[in-house]
Amino acid sequence: MFVAEDMYQLGSQRSAIRELFEYGKQRAAVVGAENVYDFSLGNPTVPAPDCVNETIRDLTQKLDSISLHGYTSAQGDIETRQAIADYLNKTYETAFSADNFYLTMGAAASLSVCFRALTTSPEDEFITIAPFFPEYRVFVEANGAKLVVVPPHTSDFQIDFEALEKAISAHTKGVIINSPNNPSGAVYSKETIQKLAALLTKKSEENGTPIFILADEPYREIAYDGVEVPYVTKYYANTLVCYSYSKSLSLPGERIGYVIVPDEVTESKTVYAAIAGAGRALGYVCAPSMFQKVIASCVGLSLIHISEPTRQEAIS
């Protein structure tokens, strides 16, 4: 075969999620979309906030096309990065600046550049807690590392710390956490994050090298009934936050998100530069320019107040 076998396999065989999505479209054509309940892709059924369309309208009317559609800085427009930092600082009492952010084509790109930046050997490992988004394995392996899966406590899908500690080795580069979790919906409490931080601090010292938390957070705002989703960087210094606006602003097809590299990260400027280099090597330079401007205007809005009535109707 004159093409890469692993890439051929990925391209010729859909994931189970994609298979279900395509099957759902086929069934909708037969029985009507209103009769098909699609639990495959995370496509929101709630429209984007009015701010999104209003901002797009204003941008197309007031900006020239070169300014609107041209390249931004590789790491993203500084005004957008600062707007995100200001919002997070106000909301979570963090202390980020624009320089902590690298804007990406969504959380998938964020994770991919982090895996590429941190992987230095084919023996390197990233751990995740089951159940998990199946593309984690694709992203990790495509960037030259191995994915290690740790089973959760099956009663509540929380972290089994005994199993996690056994899984950590001298090759562990990071632990991927996804809270609120896709697909279980589990949320890790502050106490859980603190316990995870203590374990990784201990293991980092034993290994003589930092073990990172990669906090995959596209569902951060989708937590109900007063459930708190702790901001992980406040509890563990070596945390890289991978975020997408796909869910919070109902923009999955626009591919816009970011990586945060806090100043507290070990050799943070080196890590940031490696992430920027990974973005360059993987072709993820310059997130969609118009939607960078949309995010600057709409940052902080969430669909939770819109989707809550739908949720209540579904569970009543």
Where do the protein language model's features map onto the residues?
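Residue-level marker for buried hydrophobic side chains located in beta-strands
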Residues: 213-214
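Conserved core segment of the aminotransferase class I/II
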Residues: 237-307
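Short catalytic/ligand-binding loop motif for oxyanion handling, primarily in non-cytosolic enzymes
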Residues: 45-49, 183-186, 221-222, 250-252
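N-terminal small-domain helix-loop-helix segment of the aminotransferase-like
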Residues: 2, 6-106, 298-300
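Conserved core of the PLP fold type I
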Residues: 65-208, 220-235, 240
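Walker B catalytic acidic pair
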Residues: 217
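Positively charged, low-complexity/disordered segments
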Residues: 308-310, 315
